UniProtKB/Swiss-Prot annotation:
It comes from Eremothecium gossypii (strain ATCC 10895 / CBS 109.51 / FGSC 9923 / NRRL Y-1056) (Yeast). Microtubule binding protein that promotes the stabilization of dynamic microtubules. Required for mitotic spindle formation. This is Protein STU1. The keyword Cytoplasm applies. InterPro entries: ARM-like, ARM-type_fold, CLASP_N_dom. Transmembrane segments: none annotated. Pfam families: CLASP_N (PF12348).
Amino acid sequence: MEEPRVHNLEKLMDEGVAGIEQLQILTAFKTHVKKELVRDDSIERYFDALVRFLGQPVEDRKVQQLGHSSLCYLIKRVAMQQPGRFQGARIRDLVRVVLLQEQLQERKVWGSAVKSLEAIYLCKPQAFEAELASICAATRGSDRTKCLLFMDELIQLQQMNNRNPMEVVNRFVDLWVDVLNESDPGCSKRDIELIHDILKKYFNEAMLQQFAERVVNTRSLKHFMHTEHAAPSSAQTTSSMPSGPFDVDEELTRVMEELPPNVVNSNIGEARDYLSFEHVVKDLEHITVAFQAIKETEHNWKQRQEGIITLRKIVNGNVSRQFPDEFIQACRDLNIADCISKAALSLRTTLSSHSCHLIKEMAFKLGPLLEPLLDVLFVPLRSLLSATKKISSQTAFATAAILLCTAPYHNRLFQQCIALSRDKNVSPRTFAAVFLRIYIIRFHRRLEHSSVLVEEWLHKGLTDPQTQVREAMRVTLWYWYVPNAQSAKKVLDSMPHQMKRIIEGSIPTYLNIEYHVTASVSSNESSRRSSFGVRRYPSYAAPTQSSNLQKLAANSLGGSANVRSLSENTNRHLTTYTSLAKKSLATRHESLSPRVASSGLISSAGAANLSSENLELTEELTSNHSNTLLKKYLNTNEPAVIRKSEGEPTGDLESMYSHLSSTTLQEKQQGLLFLKNLLLLKAPLDIAKLNPLLVQLSIQSPKSFKDLLTLASFHPLIPLANLIELFAINDLPTNVLLDEFSSTDLLETVIHSFQTFFPDHHDQLFLYYVKYRSVIFNYCFGIMIDLLSGDFAFSEGSTLFREVCTRIIEACGNDFNMEKYYTLISILYRADKSQFVELLRDAPVSSKFKIANELQRCDSTFNLHSIMSRESTAESHHSDPNQQYKDGAHGGDARDANGTSNSSSDSDNEPDLESTKHLLEMTMVNPIGLGCVENVLQSHIHAYKQDQQHQDPIAEKSLSTVAEVNDEDGDGSTTTQMKLMGANTTEPSNESDKDKTSDIVAESMRGTDDPNYAKLCAIDSALIDSEDEPELNNFGGLKGLTEMTKVVSIYEKLDGDEDVEMVDDEKFKDPVEQENQETGLDEIFRDEKHDQSVKFNDIPRIIDVNKSWDRYDGESIEDTSGNTSHGTDENRPASFGTVSELVRKEMEKSPTLPLNEEDSKLLSDGINEIELKHKDDPFVRDSEDCENGTPQDRSNFLSCKQHIDILGALPDNSLTAFELGLLEILDVSDMDANRILETVNTIQNSRLRSADVSRIVGAIVSHCTDPLLHWLTDSNGLQRLWSMLTALSTADGFSDSYKCVVLYTALLIANSQLSSSHLSTDELSDAWAFALRELSKLSSYNNETYIACCELRETLIEHYSSSYLPQLLESAIKELNVAEDRVRITFLLQTLSDALDHMNTLLSLEVLGSMSSLLQQFVTNDFTEWRYHSIKLLAQIYGILVARNSPASYIRSMFSILRQPEFDLVKSYYTMDHN
C-alpha cells in the first residue's frame, strides 16, 4: 500500500509565499484529503496549521475560501478515520474557526461548515454541545446568531434521523433562558426573535407560555406575550403536534376513513404467543417449505395459505412486542418477505387477501422496524394496484396506504410511488394521489428538497384525462399548499384558466386555508371591449341602478383580491412548469426558494424586504439550504448585503469571474448563474474579460446557456457567430436574432462561419462540430430563409450576393436538412438568376448537377445545359453570323499591324492557359470548346456558307473542307476528324498532309477575284498560328488537359516517342512497334474499324493471358490478323509474378479521381446499360454453356458475371446464417422475377407485412436466378426491397425487430456481392440507426436481437470498410456522447474497437487523443463490461502509439486522466494481447 503523503501546510504562513503558491498548496492538500486517508501523526499538525492560517487576516478571498473548505474536508476525514481525536479544546478551536468566520460569505460556506461540524457532533455529541453552549454564551452579535442557527441545525438533524427533537431542545433551553435574561447591552433584538422563532417550531402555545414564565427581562418578554401568530395563518388547525403545520394523527385518520373499511378493520381473531424465539424460528422455517416451489400449484396453494395465516397469528402475538428485532432479522434470513410477495401475487383471491392483511398488520405492529423489508413488500402491492379484480386492487391500495402511514421515509419507496402516477391504468394513478398526500402530511420537510418532483407529480395528476384522478389530486394540491404555498401557486399558475378555477373551488374546508381567488375580468368588460371606450346603451336598454351597484361591488371585491394576488406574485418564480421539467441547474436552484408566504416566520419588517430578497438570485443559488431561519437572520446586518439590496453587487463580480475561470464544469455553470443575476441587476461588466471565458464554455457546455440566451443584455457579451451556434443548439426561435441584429451582419456572419465547421482532427473543436454541425447548418439555413423571404434585398454593386451564393454552393453535400438547403437555393436563384447561374458554372461537378436538377424541378424554364459550359450562351448561340465574319476578316489585318490578335470574339472565349486548376473538371463537360481551332474553323466555314448559298456552285464545291467534332464515343472524350468532302484525296495523317489541306483551299480560290478569298486566308492563318501556340496540342486542345485525358486503346500500337512512359524499361517494346513511331488516332478510326462492338477474341497483348503466363501451352495460337505464332515470344515476360508487378505499376500510374456516391452510381448504371455484342469467343461460350446451356438466356454480359451467395459469406455458427437457412427451407420455387414484381406491387398497394419481405429475401438466398438478378440490378429491385424493409421497421406497432436486423444483414451482403453498390450511405445509415434504436430497448445481452445487431455491425465493417467505416466511426462516437443505456454503450464500445482495428493507420494522433479522453471516463465505471471494453480500446490506442514510436512522455500525457494503476492495467492488457 502506498504511504500517505505529507503536506507542509506551515508554509502557508510564510511571508514570502505568494497567493498562487498558497492556492497550489491548499488545492493539493484538499485533493489528498478528499480521496485518501491522512497520516495519523500529521493530523494535529494539519489542524494547527489551518487554524492558525484561517485565524489571521488573509487578503486573497479565494485563498481564504479554499483554506476553509480544506479544513472542513479534513474534519470529515478525521471523523471517519479517528473520531477520538476530537476533544474539548480542539472542538472549541474548530467551531470558532469554521463557524465564526466573518470575512467569508456565510451563505456560501454555511453548508460545508454545517456538514463538517455535524460530523464532530456525531462523534462527540455531549462535548460538542457543551463547547457550543459556552461559545454562544461568551459571544455577541453575529457570532451568537450563528451559534443559535447552528443549534437549530442540530435539532433538525435529530428530527431527520427519526428521533425526538425535543431531547436536543430541552438541553439548550436553559442556555436560551440565560441569554434572554441578560441585561442591556446583552442579547440583541435579532437574537431574541431568533430564539422565539426556534421555539415556535417545536413548542405549542402552552409550552411557550411556560417558557415565558422563566424570562424576567422585559425587553425579551414582550416577544412571548402575544403568541397568536405561533402557527401560520394559512394553516390554523387544532393541531396538537408542535413540529409542523399538520396534526399528523388527525390527518392520517382522515386518510384512513377514505380506505375500504373491510380492509382496515379486518383482523385475525387468534394470536400465538411464544416463550422462546427458537420456537418462532422453527415455525418460520416450516412455513417456508411450501414456498420453495417456483410456481403455485393445486397442491401447495393451501399450504401457502395456512402458512400466511400462521404468520398473521405470530405477528398479532407477543413476538412483535418481545422479539421485534429478532423477528425482522429472521424474516430477512429466511426470505419471509419473498414468501409474502409470492402469496400476494397469487391468482386465488383468499390467499392474496390474507397476504395483504399480513403486510397491514406487520405495519401496525412493527412500524419503523419494518424498513429493511419495505422494498420487497411494496413491489407486489404495486402490481396488485393494477389488478382487474376490484377487490384485489382495493385491498392492495388500503395495505399500501397503511404501510406508508407507518413506515419511515424511504427514497426508493417514494420513487416507486412516483412511477405509479405514470401507470397506464387509471386506478394506480388515482391511488398515487393519495400516496402523495400521505407523504406531504408526514414528511413535508423532506419533500422541500424534492419540490421539483412533487410539482411534476401534481401537474401530471391535475391534467390527467380521467376525472377521478384529477379530483383526488386537487385535494392533494391543497395539502401541499399548507407547508409550501409558493410551490403550490407555481403549479396553479401553470394550469389553464378554466382548470385553475375548478381547482380553486375545491379547497377542503378542514384545512382552513386562507386563499383568495383571483378575480378574473368579466367577459362583458374584456380587454378587447375596453379598447373601444365606454359602452354606450340605447335609451330603452340602459342598465338599471341595481345592476350598477352589483357591478361596483364586484369590482371592489375583485380589486381587493387583485391587491392580494399582486403581493403574492412578487414571490412567484419566473420559470414555468415546463422549464422546471427540464431540471436545469438554474431552475433547480430557483425552485428552492423559502416558503415565506406560508411559514408565517417573517416579521413585518422582513416582509417589507421580501421582494428584494427574492430578486437576489445569488443567495438562492449559492446556498440551497432549506432552513428558512438562515434566510431571515444570517448576515442581515452586514454591509455587503445592504449594498446588494440597493442593487450594487460588489462580491458577485469576483465570484462570477472566479467560477468562470475554474477548471470544473459545475463551477463554470454556477458562474453563468452569477452572470444572470448581474445582468438582471444591470451591473457593469468587462466584456473583454468575459468574452474568451464565455466562448470556451459555449464549446464545452453549450446547453448551459439556454436561460441566458433569453436575456437581450447577454447577447453583446459573446461574438455573433458563437451566439448563433448557441441559439441553434438550444433550439431557440430565429426571430430574436432577426429583430436584434442587422440583416447584413447576420448574413456575413453566417457565410463566414461555414468555413469553421470543418476543423482539423487535431483541433479541439473537431468533436464539437462532429456533434452539432448538422444542427448549426440547419439553423443557419433557417435564418437565411427567414431573412431572404422577407423584405431584404441585396444592394446593387455589392459582393454580398456573390459571397452568399458561393458559400451556399460550396456547402452542398454535407450533413444537413436537404429540404431547407434546396429551399434556400431556390430563393437565391430567384433573387438574381443570371448571376446565380454564372456562379453555378464554377461549382464542382457533383454539386453543380445536384443543384441544377433541383432548380429544374422548381423552375421549368431553367435550362440544364446553361451550366454545362463556361461560354456565355447568349454570345455563342445568338450572335450574328455576319458579325462573326467581320471579326474574322479583320482579325488578320489587326494581327499584321500589331503583331497580336485583337479579335474580340476570340479574346472573350480564350481559356486561361496559365491556370489549370479546373482542367480536371473540364474533362467531364469540355468547357473550353471555343478554344479549339476546329471550332474557329467551323464558325468561319459556317459564315462563308451563309454568304455563298446563291453564288457559283463550282466555287462552293471546291470549298469542301469541313471540320467535324465527333463526340459519340460515350466516355466523354472528344475525337476530332478532318475530312475532305467532295475531293478525291485521302485524309491527312501527318504534317505534310496538313500543308496539303491548306494548299487545296488556296488552289481552289487562286486566280479568282472572289472577295471571300480573304476569309479563307484568315482561316489558313488561324490554322498555322494555332500550330505555333506553345500551349495547344495538335488537336486544338490544351496540352495539360490532353495529357490528363489521354486515351490509349489496348488494340492500338504504342507510340514510341509520346507513350514511352506507358511501359517500363522497354519490356513491352518490340521491333515492329519501334519502326512505327508515327501512328495517330486515325489508325483506330478507319472505315473497317467502325464496328462499335468489342471483339473479345482479340485479346489485348498487355492482358493476353494466353501469351503471358500459365494459360500459355506452347501451341500455336491464332491472333486477330490470322497469323500464327509458334513457341515463346522473346519479349514476353517469363513469369506471372513479373507481369503482375508491371500491371500493378501501371495501375499506380493511372490517375484515380475521387468520385462521390452519386457520381459513382451514375457511372455504374451507365456501364451496366451498355449492350455488348458477342462474337464467336470460345471462352465466353463455354462459360455460358456451363451455366445456362444456351447463350440466349443472358440479358447482358455483366449479369452473367454476377453471383449472389449470402450464406457462403456468413460463418456457419452465426445466428443470421441460421435464420436465413430457415428462409431457404421455405417453398419459394414460384418466386421468379415476375412473381416478385407482382408481390412488390401488391405490397405497395396494401399493408406491408414482414412475411412478404421474408419470402423475397428467401428467394434471393436459396436460388438467385438470372431474371431475379436482373431485377435486383437493372430494375432497382434491391433498392425497392430495402425501402420496403425500412418502411416496415419504422411502422407503428411493429414488433419483429429481430427479423428486420437479419434481413438488413442479408441485403447488405447481397449488395456487396454485386458488381456495383446499389445502396447509398444514407441507406446504410438507416440500418445502423435502426440497430441502435433496438439496442436502447434491451436490458440484457442474452438476447437474439443483440447478437443479430453484432453480426450486422460485422457485416458493415467487413464489406463496407472503405466506403462507410469513417462515417460509422463518427456515428459511434456521436452516439457514445449521448447514450445512457447499458447495453447500447457496450455495443458502441465494441464498435469502436472493431473500427479501430481496421483504421488504426488512418487515424491521426489528435483523433486518437480525443478518443482516449472520451474512453477514460468509462474506466472507473461500475459496470464491468464498460470497464473491460474501455481498457481494451485504450490498449489498442496505446499499441498504435507504440507502433508509431511515440515518446513515453507523450503517451503518458495522452492517458493523463488515468491513475497510475489504471495506466499499468492498460499496458498489461496491450502486452498480453500483443504476445
